[in-house]
Amino acid sequence: MDKSSGELVTLTPNNNNTVQPVALMRLGVFVPTLKSLKNSKKNTLSRTDATEELTRLSLARAEGFDKVEITGPRLDMDNDFKTWVGIIHSFARHNVIGDKVELPFVEFAKLCGIPSSQSSRRLRERISPSLKRIAGTVISFSRTDEKHTREYITHLVQSAYYDTERDIVQLQADPRLFELYQFDRKVLLQLKAINALKRRESAQALYTFIESLPRDPAPISLARLRARLNLKSPVFSQNQTVRRAMEQLREIGYLDYTEIQRGRTKFFCIHYRRPRLKAPNDESKENPLQPSPAEKVSPEMAEKLALPEKLGITLDDLEKLFKSR
């Protein structure tokens, strides 16, 4: 529902956009490929605490689960994210029988953004590894008390079957997770920006995160954007990656921003977002945010403000702490 008008808005995927669950976009399930050979060969298992977002699912509420964790191989932006887009499109556009959907393999490849001109072998080489990684991503719901533990373990996709000779793909989802595929807090993700950022995975990942934020978002800390990318390089190198990705988002016309500093913490103020990569007819609807001037703080206060970052404590950590009180 559009809060400003009260109008019910239906979000429908097509070739230019996809409906993505906000949780997966904010949590960093899809991240840039680790570029260095050293990092790409080790620590490729990703572990994400999804408690805050996914305990809102009816499965978690009904069973009283209070902890949700997503584990599995790192899912990249260049191939895995596009395959996930194809999966979302498949369930949205085709008849779901029970917990399965079936469609032509060539059509599934198109939904994944792969040109139909590519050979069958190249299609398999791109789709097969991504399906394996996505199907290998585990979502666990659990609750532990002093004496007992209760846990439900499932996968992002339960199974995938394809036969290029028969030209079919069959995808199976956990019925108890259909709500995740059709989460009520969704955004319409324009694929135009993703396509304009080919091979710029860090910019793609930040795009999916920023586009999931509500209208007129608060300033986003540099530390939060680093966390979204989930890189393994030194912090100064990660900062460079974030700034380069933000500049790439500005270059394609998606957003404009100002980087500011409060105390020792860096923030990005987003002035507007344009997922269609062009200005709207009425630019006043963008409600641009003006950057807040840097406040003068005493050396003592500046030292206190810098302490959480030194300890590796993010704004999300502090927010969770205050909510738990």
Swiss-Prot record:
Pfam families: Rep3_N (PF01051). InterPro entries: Initiator_Rep_WH1, WH-like_DNA-bd_sf. GO terms for biological process: DNA replication initiation; plasmid maintenance. Residues 279-300 are annotated as: Disordered. Keywords: DNA replication, DNA-binding, Plasmid, Plasmid copy control. The keyword DNA-binding applies. This protein is essential for plasmid replication; it is involved in copy control functions. In vitro, binds to the DNA repeat units, BCDD'D'', EFG and HIJ. Belongs to the initiator RepB protein family. This is RepFIB replication protein A. It comes from Escherichia coli. The gene is repA.
